[in-house]
């Protein structure tokens, strides 16, 4: 059986890119590896297919093995981590040793290191100087925010390696300013891959898939559904020689999707429900307040994450205790005693109360049993009541999200459900 160092693959079979992330802290679960996800998205933008992601610890032998294997099956290897002045920053030396290439000290890196040092000292420590050593013949990818530069190097035919530090902000800046341009100028970018994401609420993934079954079998562009708590995403992805070509492929599919689903589609790409609600209220020059009992301020939190939210959001009351509902929102004790805190009658009274208290156009209230305790046969865990009160709108409704959900899931579903109904109510008011 051949070892990894003896593996040979015909260069014609080599294709695409792979990602290698280095760091024992990733393997141990101490930090989340967001770099791979981000790089994968950037490769897609450049039209570079990628088929493998690997994580290894700070071990020279395993690193050399991983680099050799990648060089025999892929055209491009992108690495993160393992760069810097500390003893476990071993990547550059291992890469050079793997391809039997000497390291050379780069004066331009030394000058940059001195300029970035706090006191601009002329003498650098040996650990700092280590960062100026790169394989002979490699191009430098400058690090604008940190000290450890990356390299762009083709140590063998039909194979290029790019190295980056593990700090996400440094990686992203180096990629945007230099690495992506190097990939394009060296003809490593094959085609353009463009995507458009549509967001849906108030519909399950299976029901949505049934409605768009004929689109899901499309080859270019491809159409795929992805479910998350309370919402569904549909990603349309097209390949072509230019972004103009891919956009022309995507547009008719996007148009058909929105025609089929109507108001179930609430946003595109990075748009969120709260942003859509914010824009709708801002356009109408109207305001809102919230009264929350089981969501712990989750609705208000979503709305106030948006810059400029004070233009539409006046405030809210988080009323878990019944006496707070009575004192701050004016909910009659008789209604609570007769119908219970989790009831349509109580949420309607809460919405009316917060609308008056904050002098707003719109009010939304919620009261439910998020669990894991507190449920009963008539009012189980997962039961949530809502109310929306607008200028000419009064809607109360009940949802049962199920007792098998976690407290966090029930709260999240309640927030998303409330925001989506609010979105629809404002649209209908128009």
Curated annotation (Swiss-Prot):
Signal peptide feature range: none
InterPro entries, alphabetized: CinA (IPR050101), CinA-like_C (IPR036653), CinA_C (IPR008136), CinA_KH (IPR041424), Competence-induced_CinA (IPR008135), MoaB/Mog-like_dom_sf (IPR036425), MoaB/Mog_dom (IPR001453)
UniProt cross-references to SMART domains, sorted A to Z: MoCF_biosynth (SM00852)
Gene3D superfamilies named among the record's database cross-references: 3.30.70.2860, CinA-like, MoaB/Mog-like domain
Cross-referenced Pfam families: CinA, CinA_KH, MoCF_biosynth
Family matches, as NCBIfam families: cinA_nterm (TIGR00200), PncC_domain (TIGR00199), PRK00549.1 (NF001813)
Family: Belongs to the CinA family.
HAMAP family: CinA_B
Protein name: CinA-like protein
């Amino acid at each position: 059986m051949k070892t990894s160092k003896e593996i040979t693959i015909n260069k014609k079979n080599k294709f695409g890119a792979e990602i290698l992330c280095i760091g024992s802290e990733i393997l141990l679960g101490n930090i989340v590896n967001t770099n791979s996800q981000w790089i994968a998205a950037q490769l897609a933008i450049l039209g570079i297919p990628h088929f493998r992601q690997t994580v290894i610890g700070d071990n020279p032998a395993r690193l050399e093995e991983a680099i050799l294997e990648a060089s025999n099956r892929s055209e491009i290897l992108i690495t993160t981590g393992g760069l810097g002045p500390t003893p476990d920053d071993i990547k550059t030396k291992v890469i050079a040793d793997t391809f039997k290439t000497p390291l050379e000290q780069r004066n331009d890196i030394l000058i940059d290191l001195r300029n970035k040092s706090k006191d601009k000292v002329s003498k650098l420590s040996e650990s700092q100087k280590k960062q100026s050593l790169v394989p002979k013949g490699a191009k430098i990818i400058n690090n604008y925010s940190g000290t450890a530069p990356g390299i762009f190097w083709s140590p063998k035919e039909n194979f290029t390696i790019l190295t980056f530090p593990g700090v996400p902000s440094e990686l992203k800046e180096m990629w945007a300013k230099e690495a992506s341009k190097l990939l394009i100028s060296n003809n490593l970018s094959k085609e353009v891959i463009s995507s458009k994401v549509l967001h849906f609420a108030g519909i399950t993934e299976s029901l949505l898939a049934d409605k768009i079954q004929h689109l899901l079998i499309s080859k270019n562009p491809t159409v795929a559904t992805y479910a998350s708590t309370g919402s569904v995403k549909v990603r349309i992805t097209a390949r072509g020689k230019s972004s103009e070509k891919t956009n022309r492929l995507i547009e008719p599919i996007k148009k058909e999707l929105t025609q089929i689903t109507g108001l179930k589609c609430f946003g595109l790409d990075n748009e969120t429900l709260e942003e859509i609600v914010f824009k709708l209220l801002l356009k109408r020059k109207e305001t809102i307040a919230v009264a929350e009992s089981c969501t712990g301020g989750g609705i208000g939190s979503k709305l106030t994450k948006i810059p400029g939210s004070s233009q539409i959001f006046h405030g809210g009351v988080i009323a878990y205790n019944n006496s707070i509902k009575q004192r701050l929102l004016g909910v009659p004790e008789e209604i609570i005693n007769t119908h219970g805190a989790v009831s349509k009658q109580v949420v309607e009274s809460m919405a009316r109360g917060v609308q008056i208290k904050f002098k707003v156009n719109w009010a939304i209230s919620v009261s439910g049993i998020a669990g894991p305790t507190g449920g009963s046969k008539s009012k189980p865990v997962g039961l949530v009541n809502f109310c929306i009160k607008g200028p000419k709108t009064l809607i109360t409704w009940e949802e049962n999200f199920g007792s098998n959900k976690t407290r966090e899931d029930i709260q999240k579903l309640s927030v998303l459900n409330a925001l989506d109904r609010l979105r629809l109510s404002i649209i209908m008011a128009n």
